[in-house]
UniProtKB/Swiss-Prot annotation:
Listed GO biological process terms: cellular oxidant detoxification; hydrogen peroxide catabolic process
Keywords noted in UniProt: Acetylation, Heme, Iron, Metal-binding, Oxygen transport, Phosphoprotein, S-nitrosylation, Transport
Residue numbers carrying N-acetylvaline: V1
Organism: Equus caballus (Horse)
Descriptive protein name: Hemoglobin subunit beta
GO molecular function annotation: heme binding; hemoglobin alpha binding; metal ion binding; oxygen binding; oxygen carrier activity
Lineage of source species: Eukaryota, Metazoa, Chordata, Craniata, Vertebrata
List of residues that carry Phosphoserine: S44
UniProt entry tagged with the keyword Cell division: no
Xref: SUPFAM superfamilies: Globin-like
Cross-referenced Pfam families: Globin (PF00042)
Gene3D superfamilies, A to Z: Globins (1.10.490.10)
Amino acid sequence: VQLSGEEKAAVLALWDKVNEEEVGGEALGRLLVVYPWTQRFFDSFGDLSNPGAVMGNPKVKAHGKKVLHSFGEGVHHLDNLKGTFAALSELHCDKLHVDPENFRLLGNVLVVVLARHFGKDFTPELQASYQKVVAGVANALAHKYH
């Protein structure tokens, strides 16, 4: 990901304030509500029948936290995203057969959730930096597909 030193510092500073459980659960929940076809990868999660069920589902929240923790690893290794996500790329490609477009969708949902959580602190400049980061992470996760 091509970020200036200032952009990297801003991304890291915000990330240090992120509550992985809250933001991760909300981001994954929103992905499953807004793009319902993504639910097919989460059959074992129980009731995903309506937005309230999805957003209140403890398995969605737990997996969202796990997803966001992995994303945080990427935030701390922006110069080696492909290496950081190599094993997850292989898992999602070879075993889970996840459409790589879903990584882009989740990244965009994450940006929405960060904006909601951080309000005016999530400036347009910071959003631009995070859009670069989520695009880089999505590309790294899709790497095994190429």
